[in-house]
Amino acid sequence: MGTFGDIAVFSFHDQKNMTTLGEGGMIVVNNDRFVDVVPMLRHNGHCNFGMEREDYWLPAMGNLAIPMLEGTQIWPNNFCLGEIQCALASELLKRVDHINVEKRKRAINFIDSLSEQSLLRFHRVDSERHNYHLLVAQVSEGKRDQIIRTLAHNYGIQCAVQYYPLYRYPFYQSVGFGDAFCPNTDLFFDNMLSIPFAHSLTDGQIEFVESSIREVVESL
């Protein structure tokens, strides 16, 4: 990990393949220029005084500074993970390859089982580098909302719509980012659905989701 580019960022959100009890993340640095910056960003700008000290507690236990990255100041914050979260992550890291293999296998089986449904278009990737964090389908003929509504009301399955383009949010529109012209993004977002696909789901639950989607699509 971390060999692509100078800095690699990993999310450990609860819905990711590897999690740290809800929230968390990791930064991996592959460039010595940034090694001292990351710890400062993580913990409120804490750093050493940069001088030899006869007494380790004087003038204080630690210094504070604003991290600099390529000549630009970056305001730090408290992004530290707790000990329990780190302990869990350390154990899950040993299993993440197995988890990814399981996710890929489930995703390919799911996609292939619905391949005859012309209303649904999946992005099927055979590469072992694709971990299927999300299982997403694009729905044709404007049937997306009808499918989501029927799955939720009749089967208790809540699909999601992810992720709202930033330029559609009123907040970003209010600060001048609402004029973006992204027709492909709009087309995809307005016709996509994200299928429940957490690693914690059992094989039976995954099969129920798949069969329910088939029933709904074939009824349209």
What are these model-predicted stretches?
Residues 1-4, 27, 177-180:
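Short, hinge-like loop/turn segments at secondary-structure boundaries
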Residues 1-21, 36, 68-71:
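Conserved active-site segment immediately N-terminal to the catalytic lysine
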Residues 2, 10-11, 25-30, 60:
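Short beta-strand-to-turn element immediately C-terminal to the catalytic PLP-Schiff-base lysine
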Residues 16, 25, 42-45:
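Short, well-ordered alpha-helical segments in soluble proteins
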Residues 22-23, 84:
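A conserved catalytic-core signature of glycosyltransferases
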Residues 30-220:
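PLP-dependent aminotransferase class I/II
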